[in-house]
Amino acid sequence: MISAGEVLKVIKERIENFDGQVKCESVGEVISVKDGIALVYGLEKAKFGEVVAFANGTIGVVLNLDCDTVSIVIFGSENSVGEGDIVKCTNQLMDVPVGLELLGRVVDALGNPIDGLENFDTKTRLPVEIKAPGIIDRQSVTEPLQTGIKVIDMLIPIGRGQRELIIGDRKTGKTAIAIDTIINQKSHNNEVIDKEKVYCIYVAIGQKNSSVARIINKLRESGALEYTIVVVAGASDSASLQYLAPYTACAMGEFFRDNGMHCLIVYDDLSKHAAAYRQMSLLLRRPPGREAYPGDVFFLHSRLLERAAKMSDKKGGGSLTALPIIETQAGDVSAYVPTNVISITDGQIFLESEIFYKGLRPAVNVGLSVSRVGSSAQIKSVKKVAGSIKLSLAQYRELEDFAKFGSDVDVHSQKILDRGRRMMELLKQKQYSPLSVGEQVAVIFAGTSGYLDDISVNDISKFEERLLSELNSNYPDILSSISNNNFTDDIRSLLSKVISKIASSLK
């Protein structure tokens, strides 16, 4: 028989060990799950954009708030969430791991590694949705970001902190330009301290896994993966993860920007991102608008791209440069999403199928492409030769259309046409073969100065190969002087002699 003393002792222990703190949780119950959207009853204190946790550990984000229910987008497999499951509010916003530890890694839209390597230990996490820097915190674009592609660096220059859209039909070389730009940063990064390096982030949205694997292998082969983060939300991933991926990557890029470093981010592509958001919005029963997109599809991309900026010196002087990619249908740039992104960005690089099939690669339409702020970031040695090439090509395009209607062309016009054809040939460039600033200036200088006028158009590529080989082997000082913005009269005359010597051997 239990004595009264023992009972009192147990009661006393229970009272002493009682934790008086009351733990309050906002809890709801899943009513239905379909197409990646969970309808939950309860969660009265849930906030828009708040992360919630399901019973099995899967997370989601609140995107609709109704009287008695909330609609939650599930980040993960919907098969693991069932009717009647308990859902808890976390009182947190969506955040992802950021930092230098992620360089060289492949992660998913939640920041989890998917490359089969060990987990990374990052102490820093940043919210995926954050307000873009204000006007006072920014400064104008003043430093160039070299792509290594002649036609872009000379005619459509990109500066650090700029948003430059790459737009064109499928299979016109949009991704190739972005990957070439990432690979080109290797030579720059090898010459500067860590603070001045350009770190890169490539975001694959709705891409085939085979295509993404090919890009990762190319980055690894060229030694570019060591300063690059690859974020993947493939075609087999849910619409919610494809929607989240660009914001995840942008948060990772902001780590570099806000710590006084430089970062380049490629969104490939925002057309599929908009389609994923359209799918989510329709499933959330939001009213459709033009082309069935929701009314806030402009805000979807503007709040993402406005986070790319060149920060003021007070804020560390870091930069985040964005290269969003848009895929058009049959060259229609007046569609809803393309016009939205064109109006948000600081310029666009138009790629055309017709130019591509003519064999002009990269297939950039120089007449329609523009960079609104990048020209102020060009170095002087580039500006000296870039101005004359713009004029030459403008005159060539005008006369080319005119010459189609008649065979009789005066001597002056014929001279412009001949030089224009050689300049177009000179702007051709093979994929994965970026050129340094010095090499680009030397090649374009040869064309604009008339040294190629007597060379056959078919021999232009041969001339370029010989010139670059000669300069790299015997005159590296010329290339380094031009790259260091030191294109003096002495350098110009020495370069002219080298060009004349090679040109005369091909006449």
UniProtKB/Swiss-Prot annotation:
Q: Where is this site: Required for activity?
A: S369
Q: How does it assemble?
A: F-type ATPases have 2 components, CF(1) - the catalytic core - and CF(0) - the membrane proton channel. CF(1) has five subunits: alpha(3), beta(3), gamma(1), delta(1), epsilon(1). CF(0) has three main subunits: a(1), b(2) and c(9-12). The alpha and beta chains form an alternating ring which encloses part of the gamma chain. CF(1) is attached to CF(0) by a central stalk formed by the gamma and epsilon chains, while a peripheral stalk is formed by the delta and b chains.
> What do the Gene Ontology cellular component annotations say?
plasma membrane; proton-transporting ATP synthase complex
Task: Write out the entry's keywords from A to Z.
Answer: ATP synthesis, ATP-binding, Cell inner membrane, Cell membrane, CF(1), Hydrogen ion transport, Ion transport, Membrane, Nucleotide-binding, Translocase, Transport
One Pfam family cited in the UniProt record for this chain: ATP-synt_ab_N
A GO molecular function assigned to this protein is: proton-transporting ATP synthase activity, rotational mechanism
What is its biological role?
Answer: Produces ATP from ADP in the presence of a proton gradient across the membrane. The alpha chain is a regulatory subunit.
Residues bound to ATP are: G168, D169, R170, K171, T172, G173, K174, T175
Enzyme's top EC category: translocase
Catalyses: ATP + H2O + 4 H(+)(in) = ADP + phosphate + 5 H(+)(out)
Q: Which InterPro entries match?
A: ATP_synth_asu-like_sf, ATP_synth_asu_C, ATP_synth_asu_C_sf, ATP_synth_F1_a_nt-bd_dom, ATP_synth_F1_asu, ATPase_a/bsu_AS, ATPase_F1/V1/A1_a/bsu_N, ATPase_F1/V1/A1_a/bsu_N_sf
Q: How does it sit in the membrane?
A: Peripheral membrane protein
Q: What is this protein called?
A: ATP synthase subunit alpha
Q: Which HAMAP family match?
A: ATP_synth_alpha_bact (MF_01346)
Q: Taxonomy-wise, where does this protein's organism fall, top ranks first?
A: Bacteria, Pseudomonadati, Pseudomonadota, Alphaproteobacteria, Rickettsiales
| Native organism | Ehrlichia ruminantium (strain Gardel)
Subcellular localization, as worded in the UniProt entry:
Cell inner membrane
